[in-house]
Regions:
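Sec/Tat signal peptide C-region and signal peptidase I cleavage site
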Residues: 19-23
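N-terminal secretory/targeting leader peptides
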Residues: 12, 24-110, 128-325
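A gly/proline- and charged-residue-enriched helix-loop-helix capping module
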Residues: 111-130
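Bacterial N-terminal signal peptides that target proteins for export
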Residues: 1-11
Length: 325
């Protein structure tokens, strides 16, 4: 190797070392286990997109399973307080902060297939709720269905008196309308609560069959009613975001937007497999007929107007926009 070639090789190595040493590593906190499908299907592509979009100047490190602090309910505050640079959570866990966002989860408001794109088409309507953080990703999920341990649910009468875990207040209103008792509980606690009989069932999408092993503790799965739909988000600490260059901020936001679509598509695909998996594990899948579903939907229908009236502001505009009215 000639002197000039050696010089180029050394110079290149020094530039690479300087770039790596100067990289900003951002922490992403998730309460879900490291075995969750979201790691390979969503987070790793997000990590790659951030690194690629910033030329390696910004990297993302995952902290799964509550490694930066236990409890899904505290996820939003971890981003606000800077414990994590990014945090994934559900707006329903801190519902008082996100009344407008949560209109998207009301029964029959979101189209399962187009919900995430519909949300982003009208994202300005939600922007005021994210003043304390930087919104990076927001997506709709698969419909929430009803897992039950012992009672096969085919009519609202079957729900009477049952203790049903719900992901949010709005989902709780639906359970109440059917005659059940809503129980607020993080997803990580459902398995033990159902196994021990603390709850009789749970409202959650069918990714939970495998992701949270509900196929092991529930015997019945009821679907076909107008369902609530739990939004997910990734939010970022404002100071961490502000500390990035304009170019790198744009790269993070672009990666987050891509992650929204990817997360939604992945959840829908895994949820579809979750129904089949439930049957394979010996569970009963109850697919309501049109007449059976109508009995549930008639009781749920007034919830939308009730919540819109309580929230006020532009809640009615959001519901109309998401419904395509």
């Amino acid at each position: 190797m000639g002197l000039f070639s050696k010089f180029n090789a050394v110079a290149g190595a020094l530039v690479l070392a300087a770039t790596t040493a100067g990289a900003t590593e951002l922490k992403l906190a998730d309460f879900q286990p490291p075995t969750h499908f979201v790691v390979d299907k969503v987070y790793k592509p997000f990590q790659d997109a951030v690194s690629s979009g910033t030329g390696g100047a910004v990297t993302v490190r995952l902290y799964m399973g509550g490694e930066l602090g236990p409890g899904p309910v505290e996820q939003y505050n971890r981003a606000v307080d800077g414990v994590a640079d990014f945090a994934i959570s559900l707006p329903g866990y801190t519902a008082s902060n996100f009344p407008l966002t949560l209109t998207a989860e009301l029964p029959g408001v979101i189209n399962t297939e187009t919900g995430t794109e519909d949300i982003w088409s009208h994202i300005d309507l939600f922007a005021d709720e994210y003043r304390r953080v930087q919104l990076v990703s927001l997506w709709s999920s698969a419909p929430n269905v009803l897992y039950t341990r012992d009672v096969a649910v085919r009519s609202p009468a079957d729900v009477q008196g049952l203790n049903i875990r719900v992901p949010s207040r709005n989902a709780g209103l639906q359970v109440e309308a059917w005659g059940g008792n809503p129980v607020s509980m993080p997803v990580t606690e459902i398995y033990n609560a159902m196994q021990t009989g603390v709850i009789d069932g749970a409202m959650i999408d069918t990714t939970a069959t495998r992701a949270f092993r509900l196929g092991e503790v529930a015997k019945h799965l009821t679907l076909g009613f107008d369902a609530t739909n739990s939004p997910f988000f990734i939010v970022m600490n404002r100071d961490a975001f502000g500390g990035l260059s304009d170019k790198n901020q744009a790269a993070v936001l672009e990666a987050g937007r891509e992650a929204s679509t990817l997360a939604n598509q992945t959840q829908l695909r895994v949820a579809e497999g979750g129904v089949a998996a439930f049957e394979e594990m010996g569970g009963e899948v109850i697919r309501l007929t049109g007449e059976e579903a109508a009995a549930f939907n008639a009781l749920s229908a007034p919830i939308v107007d009730k919540v819109v009236a309580e929230v006020g502001g532009n809640a009615a505009d959001i519901v109309k926009a998401l419904r395509g009215e």
